[in-house]
Each structure stands twice: as structure tokens, then as C-alpha cells.
């Protein structure tokens, strides 16, 4: 919106030329989203407390979590509000990639909202029935996948980029739709599984979003794309503003979500943020790098798959509890230790993921 106003006013006030620079809009995007989150936080927490919208804690979980019962949840609403407002203000709204990410963010946010509402307001511990949750996640992902394929068919936007191999970029064809579907749905659920401790999911999300901001900038710059031997995708540079909005909103939420948490994001936040990260990874053609940078999400998901598979096949559990962050809690690790160590792992993995762009 502001970039449009800047174009109108630039002939009269040269100052407005500043708003056309991507670097400037990326910085103010972080600050805007951060400011909105910090402003909304206390007000939303107070409102959630008044409405008695509190976290439901399973009796079979770690005993240390019993004290979390009743902590306000559905705080992801303020994350989505901060991101959406910021993107509408600072992004180029003629860019289709911006709308693709917003569609997934808000669509998955709606699915998560219904799930949370049923859990904490209707007191239905199961929330939204699993098959319906999966149905709506799938429907949104497939609509976006088909739209993106139609928009970028047989161009660099539908190539598969393999780390460490600069000349391996095959056209995916219709497999692009399949890959996009699994990346969006898979990342959404992976982030949701990770969201089990105070700040555990939001900080890796912020780090991965920051990593993708750098990748989007390189992918949308023909000189850097050629230098790094990655596809040049003209529309992708505008995703920098979306990524930095996610960084700012995430940091603002972390202010209230850090241990001991004053509010939890709930499924409304976790499903939406995961879906948005998956969509961004697809748009910049770095699905494999997402697996690396989002290694904490992958680890949490694999721990659940291995736990369930082992129990069904052998009747034995591999971990004391899954996802794996609960395993370490039951081993006696204090919650802050688990959280910070997972953050450190995320920092290292994001740096490794960025390094793969050059190691070819």
C-alpha cells in the first residue's frame, strides 16, 4: 500500500523514493511487525484471561506442565495480525507471491483457530476432527499449488534445486504440485508438533524466516542468482518483506512467550506459520534447504513417527515421550535448557542451510 502511495507522491517529494528500496522496506517491516506485536500482546493476554481461554494440559504429560494449565492461548492471532498488517503496508501488493503466502497464512490460521476454539472454548479436548483438519489443510495447499504451477509452468519457478549440485535443476512438471502440497502441509504440522514448550517453536520459526529473507533476496537478484547458481525468480525478492514481517511478529510474540510463558500461540499460530514457511520455501525453490534450516521441526516430527511406528510394530517405545522435547524433559532437563539448546541447534542449521547456496 505504502509503495503505491510513494509512487504517486515521488514526483512531488523525492523523500518518498526511499520507500521503493527493498532494503528499507525490509527493515521497517521488522520494526512495524515488532511494534504491532508488542502493542497487541498485553491487550490480547488480558482479553484472553477475561474470556478464560486457557491452555488445556494433558494429564499424561510431564508434571512440570501442570502449572501451565489455564495460561492464555490462541496468541497466534496477534502474530497473524502483525504479519498481515505489515505486509499490506510495506509489500508490493501487485506481486502474486505475496498473496500466495498470505493465502496460506490466513487459511491455515483459520483452520487452527477453529481447532483451538473447539478445544478451549467448547472444552472439546480433541478439537477439530483430524480428518477435517487434514482435509482443509490439503484443500488450501492444493489450490495454492495449482495456482503457482499455472503461473510458473516450465520456468525456473518450477525447477527442482538440489543442494551441492549447481547443474542439477530438472523441470518437475506436475510433480511440482505434489511436492508443493507435501512441503506446505508437512511444514505446517511439523511446526505445530514443535510448539510444546515456551518459545520452542517461535524462535526457530524466526530464524528460518530470517534465512529465507536472505535467500529470497538472492533469488530475486539476477546477479546473485547467477553467482550462486540458483534459479533467478523475478517475483521472489518481494518475499523479503514477508519474511522480515514474520521475524518482527515472531520476536514480538516471543517477548510474551518466553519462559515462563504469558501466552501460547496455539494451533492458530503454529499451523499458519508452518504453512507460510513451506510456501516461501517452494516459491524460492529451496525445499531441501528448508529441511536443513528447519531441522528442529524435522527432528520433532521424526521422533513422533518413530515412536508411533516402533510401538505399533514392536510394542516398544523409543523415547520416553514424543515429540522429542518431552523426552528430554522426562530425562530431567529443565525446560529452559531444552528450549535454549534447541534454539542453538536452529542457529547452526540455518547457517548450514545458507552455506549450501555457495557450496556447489
Swiss-Prot record:
Any idea what job this protein has? Answer: Catalyzes the initial step of the lipid cycle reactions in the biosynthesis of the cell wall peptidoglycan: transfers peptidoglycan precursor phospho-MurNAc-pentapeptide from UDP-MurNAc-pentapeptide onto the lipid carrier undecaprenyl phosphate, yielding undecaprenyl-pyrophosphoryl-MurNAc-pentapeptide, known as lipid I.
Subcellular location per UniProt equals:
Cell inner membrane
TM region positions = 21-41, 73-93, 94-114, 132-152, 168-188, 199-219, 239-259, 263-283, 288-308, 338-358
Which InterPro entries does this UniProt record tie to the protein? Answer: Glycosyl_transferase_4 (IPR000715), PNAcMuramoyl-5peptid_Trfase (IPR003524), PNAcMuramoyl-5peptid_Trfase_CS (IPR018480)
* Family of the protein in this entry: Belongs to the glycosyltransferase 4 family. MraY subfamily.
GO terms, molecular function: metal ion binding; phospho-N-acetylmuramoyl-pentapeptide-transferase activity; UDP-N-acetylmuramoyl-L-alanyl-D-glutamyl-meso-2,6-diaminopimelyl-D-alanyl-D-alanine:undecaprenyl-phosphate transferase activity
- GO BP, sorted A to Z: cell division; cell wall macromolecule biosynthetic process; cell wall organization; peptidoglycan biosynthetic process; regulation of cell shape
Main localization, broad class? membrane
Q: Which organism is it from?
A: Vibrio cholerae serotype O1 (strain ATCC 39315 / El Tor Inaba N16961)
**EC number from the UniProt entry:** 2.7.8.13
Swiss-Prot/TrEMBL catalytic activity: UDP-N-acetyl-alpha-D-muramoyl-L-alanyl-gamma-D-glutamyl-meso-2,6-diaminopimeloyl-D-alanyl-D-alanine + di-trans,octa-cis-undecaprenyl phosphate = di-trans,octa-cis-undecaprenyl diphospho-N-acetyl-alpha-D-muramoyl-L-alanyl-D-glutamyl-meso-2,6-diaminopimeloyl-D-alanyl-D-alanine + UMP
Q: Which PROSITE patterns match?
A: MRAY_1, MRAY_2
Top-level lineage group: Bacteria
Q: In which pathway does it act?
A: Cell wall biogenesis; peptidoglycan biosynthesis
Q: Which UniProt keywords apply?
A: Cell cycle, Cell division, Cell inner membrane, Cell membrane, Cell shape, Cell wall biogenesis/degradation, Magnesium, Membrane, Metal-binding, Peptidoglycan synthesis, Transferase, Transmembrane, Transmembrane helix
CDD domains annotated for this entry? GT_MraY
This protein's GO cellular component annotations are: plasma membrane
User: This protein is called what?
Assistant: Phospho-N-acetylmuramoyl-pentapeptide-transferase
Task: Give the record's membrane topology.
Answer: Multi-pass membrane protein
Its needed co-factors are: Mg(2+)
Gene that produces this protein: mraY
